[in-house]
Amino acid sequence: MSKTRVYQIAEELNISNEELINKLAELDINVTDKDSVLEGEELELALEMLGEDLSQENGNVIEIDGKLTVQVLATKLDKSPSEIIMKLMKMGTMATINQEISFEIAALAAKDYGFELTVAESDDTEALEIEALMEIEEDKEEDLKPRPPVVTVMGHVDHGKTSLLDAIRKTDVISGEAGGITQHIGASEVKINGHKIVFLDTPGHEAFTSMRARGAQVTDIAILVVAADDGIMPQTVEAINHAKAAGVPLIVAINKIDKPGANPDKVKQELADQGLLVEDWGGEVIAVPVSAKKKEGIDTLLEMVLLVAEMEELRANPNKRAVGTVIEAELDKGRGPVATVLVQGGTLTVGDPIVAGVACGKVRAMINAKGKRVKTAGPSTAVEILGLSEVPQGGDQFVEVPTDKIARSVAARRQQIVRDEMLKSTQRLSLDALFSQMSEGSIKDLNIVIKADVQGSVQAVKQSLEKLSNEEVQVKVIHGGVGAVTESDILLAAASNAIIIGFNVRPVPGAESLGEKENVDIRTYTIIYKAIEDIQAAMTGMLDPEYVDEETGKAEIREIYKISGVGTVAGCYVTNGKIFRNCKVRLVRDSIIIHEGELAALKRFKDDVKEVNSGYECGMSFVNYNDIKEGDIVEAYITKEVERKL
């Protein structure tokens, strides 16, 4: 309806004329009586705002609690499911009776029936209490006690990681290896000078990437194993970058010093090239020459671990509810779900109810690093636990809770959240997504992993990209290497919220699917400048745009008219350029700007016009401004957004 009288609107909304007039006044729409006419924007505003207000006042508000399916919506609206399905089809959404639909779509459908959908607020006191229990307690200074360091050994294949761990444990596990890959994942404990050190046997990158991707930090110190006769290799560089990204202290073990071709100084030079300057070269990185085969330098290495641990002041409170991280977990045919956990605070005891991710249960048994059953495990202790309801994920936090019931409630709640998340479409971590997040200010750095066929390309691109950095946007190449894009690259990128750029290389089998699973964008190029252009485009989009005012025309006010019901109208003569109906205006009097605003109307004679050219007369009125005088100058302008360049 283009024009509608007040009494007609009152009938439509089922309220009295007087009540409608009062409500219109609240919306700054002034009408005199029931025969007053509303049209255009005023009419639309009145119907929209009053419709919403009245729906709430009349109780037409539906609360949605939990899963929202077509069946649930039909029941809430007191309509048949088939009618709701047809309604959704008209809206462009295909859904079956038991299919879950988005709240936004359901709200639009409900609005057509005169109802408003809202999400029910939970007043579940028990749920709030459970959440409070899950909060990690703040430790008091007097409760903190020194704890053993947790160490991960990293390095290139065949540089002697397992041999070094074997030498440290003084037990032979290499005979149980297959294809040079560590088969069992767990932990080892050694004592030196009365102090305990915990070694995680998990593959080095796992301790940093998958854990960090879930917000867990389990490693205190990383030992980087480099063969004295081989030097820095691609996986060594990966290990260095993983440790740097995690912010973990690094100790270098220069292994195989007993071999004829050993050259520790060459290794130190290559370390310096990677930004790791060793102590005897004036740096801060500890480097220890060792021979895992002859068990030389092992004690010195362990003493250095204790020294770094002392400098790090590693402490924890053993007298509170146990909390820690799941290192890895599996489903054992005979024992059910089995998880290796690292206790990081408190003391875990057999019989304690715990929650680990979406799993829960009472600890039925605990096995320590030596394969013996234990009843308690304090801070920096890794144990295998039995009794969980299902297999948790590596990197999940576990927390001890007061009762079994609370454990089940928390796990059930988390499972529901996981199900809800799975229903949402997962957005890939692409340049476009990064650009969007950056524009919102949620990302300050653009992290990149570079892989190429030759080292020269890696260095060239790294330097080119880092030159794009400015005070608003920082490009960080967190890893660059030669060779195909590997699963390790994907894990590093996922943990660091990075994208992967490849030059003349492709992902190895399995890496692409892992990239999709971890929502990592892998971009491959054959021309370097194209990659630089893409990154530059993403960064340029991050910069806040600049706005400039572009003057379109000027007019002089020559006459003033007072028109009843309209207000003050300026009779103008356009002296320069054009005056547009949708432009902004400045009123200038004696070279001083007295008002900035918008045009309420632009007319030629009695007709509304979109523009008036120079040399023509016109009538203007201004939004919420009437204090104009003859001789005032009207400057018309438009505001343009100017894209900034790097």
Swiss-Prot record:
Residues 201-204 are annotated as: G3. Residues 146-315 form the tr-type G domain. It is found in: Cytoplasm. CDD domains: IF2_eIF5B (cd01887), IF2_mtIF2_II (cd03702), mtIF2_IVc (cd03692). Residues 255-258 are annotated as: G4. Residues 291-293 are annotated as: G5. GO terms for molecular function: GTP binding; GTPase activity; translation initiation factor activity. InterPro entries: EF-G-like_DII, IF2_II, IF2_N, P-loop_NTPase, Small_GTP-bd, T_Tr_GTP-bd_dom, TF_IF2_bacterial-like, TIF_IF2. It holds the Pfam family GTP_EFTU. Residues 155-162 are annotated as: G1. GO terms for cellular component: cytosol. Keywords: Cytoplasm, GTP-binding, Initiation factor, Nucleotide-binding, Protein biosynthesis. It comes from the Bacteria. Coiled coil: none annotated. GTP binds at residues 155-162, 201-205, 255-258. Residues 180-184 are annotated as: G2. One of the essential components for the initiation of protein synthesis. Protects formylmethionyl-tRNA from spontaneous hydrolysis and promotes its binding to the 30S ribosomal subunits. Also involved in the hydrolysis of GTP during the formation of the 70S ribosomal complex. Belongs to the TRAFAC class translation factor GTPase superfamily. Classic translation factor GTPase family. IF-2 subfamily. This is Translation initiation factor IF-2. It comes from Clostridioides difficile (strain 630). The lineage of its organism: Bacteria, Bacillati, Bacillota, Clostridia, Peptostreptococcales.
